[in-house]
Amino acid sequence: MKGLKFGIMALVLLMASSLSAQSIKESFSAEGRENWKPEVTVRGNLGIYAGGFAVTGGVRIDEKRTLGLMVGKNVNVYTVRHGYADVNSFSAALYGRRYLHLGERKIFSFYSDLALGAAVVTGMEGAYWVNPVDGTTKKDDIDVEKGDVQPYFSWQPGMRVRFYKNIHLFLGPTLSSHCLGVHLGFGF
């Protein structure tokens, strides 16, 4: 447990170390903006009772940081009286990514993504059942309804491997308000 706490603190400090006022000022100056490059990733999330996919799009403001927008489709599985119910949602969040490159060629990199936004429940499947006694439709006790807005938070640390030119593989754990599991994705 101490190792997990130490790892979380180390990654949070890694993200915070990139937020010095001078480095932000340099990245957003006229000269710094000339070096901005687009960065897009597509990733899938798989957890114990959740799954989905996300697309991120942003700008790499320097060699170590990316800022952008993350949108995704999430499915959470709830255990209900008659089996399982799927709650579908759509999320949008602002995210920041911090890289720690290994070696001069930057083939391998550790990264940490932090995202904060909102998720809207778009529908439910399996939450409704027909009462065999009187034939009425019942809804199981799930505390969400279609149209509900929920806070969305995600932390995805991991390893990035560059394959060819600017094509990368992303792999690591996912700790979010909608998924506890792993993620795998590609970026360019």
Regions inferred by a protein language model and the residue ranges of each:
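Cleavable N-terminal export/targeting peptides
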Residues: M1-N35
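Short glycine/proline- and aromatic-enriched beta-strand/turn motifs that initiate or cap beta-hairpins
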Residues: A21-K73, R97, H183-G187
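Surface-exposed loop/turn segments flanking beta-strands in extracellular/periplasmic regions
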Residues: S27, G32, N131-K138
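Residues that define the transmembrane beta-barrel architecture of outer-membrane proteins
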Residues: E34-P38, Y49-F53, D86-A92, F108, ...
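Extracellular loop and loop/strand-boundary signature of outer-membrane beta-barrel proteins
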Residues: T41, T79-A85, D140-E145
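Short polar/acidic secondary-structure junctions
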Residues: N45-G47, H101, T174-S176
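Gram-negative (and chloroplast) outer-membrane scaffold detector with strong preference
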Residues: T56-T136, Q156, V161-I167, F188
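Gram-negative outer-membrane beta-barrel domains
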Residues: K146-Q150, S154-F188
